[in-house]
Amino acid sequence: MFKENKVKLGIAPIGWTNDDMPELGGEITFEQCISEMALAGFVGCEVGNKYPRDTKILKKALSLRGLSIASAWFSAFLTSKPFEETAEAFKAHRDFLYEMGAKVIVVSEQGNSIQGQMETPLFDKKPVFTEEEWDLLIDGLNRLGDLAAEKGMNIVYHHHMGTGIQTTEEIDRLMEETDPKKVSLLYDTGHLVFSGEDHLHVLNKHINRIRHVHLKDVRIEVANKVREEKMSFLQAVKAGVFTVPGDGVIDFKPVFEALDAAGYEGWFVVEAEQDPAIANPFEYALKARQYIRETCGL
């Protein structure tokens, strides 16, 4: 399964140190994090809050361990701030990733987002964009796509819990109204299943737009509890709603089969934020690596 060297396996540092809740994994160093990634058998990663931003220092640390940068998250505010503000921050982010050799830029709209709010009920208070906000988002993403293309890069949109692009309908509209040459999709199994979507339907419908994949599993009993007890996104993460592939409810075999059949090329990034004091990140990275090897041969 998968053409040789066409798909690379990475892992996100958020399992070691959490960007939204820095107290989770606060004691874990950057060096420990990337050393354990490499030791677990991964060849790449995304960027966390403890990573040095000096590209020479970062390149050396990663190359010693055989790692490279797959991408990094960018928070857009296209619906809530002037475009120029997002564009300036985006260009700096783009240039950093370009220097690190990445080909795609993860973008998520954070206007009205509740994902970083500790007390806001995730499902009851989910933001919904107005028509005016949709127009700003679509136009802004197309323009960010143009800025990415200046460096031969692509933006991949990250649908995410607690944001205006979370559900199947919202993803469908985003894909329908953005320019396919300028805006691609980041496919995240965990966010779809947690939201209550049919992740295979979304995969098959938009498979030709997918340029980046996050492999994330869901503990369904925790997901149900989040709905019932009106928990926030951050409370859900602390409660363990997400875990690594093979440790939750999702069967990844049909996901891999569909992406293989479509000739997917790019990164698979294991991204499973949970409390490292409860779920040892190295142990869970090893679990994920073994499951992926057994399930699709990578």
From Swiss-Prot:
Q: What's its catalytic activity?
A: scyllo-inosose = 3D-3,5/4-trihydroxycyclohexane-1,2-dione + H2O
CC cofactor:
glutathione; Co(2+); Mn(2+)
The pathway that the record names for this protein is:
Polyol metabolism; myo-inositol degradation into acetyl-CoA; acetyl-CoA from myo-inositol: step 2/7
In alphabetical order, the GO MF annotations are: manganese ion binding; myo-inosose-2 dehydratase activity
Q: Which UniProt keywords apply?
A: Cobalt, Lyase, Manganese
What highest taxon heads this organism's lineage? Bacteria
InterPro entries named among the record's database cross-references? IolE, IolE/MocC, IolE/XylAMocC-like, Xyl_isomerase-like_sf, Xyl_isomerase-like_TIM-brl
- GO terms under biological process: inositol catabolic process
What EC number(s) has UniProt assigned to this enzyme?
4.2.1.44
The record's family statement is:
Belongs to the IolE/MocC family.
Q: What is this protein called?
A: Inosose dehydratase
The species this protein belongs to is Geobacillus thermodenitrificans (strain NG80-2)
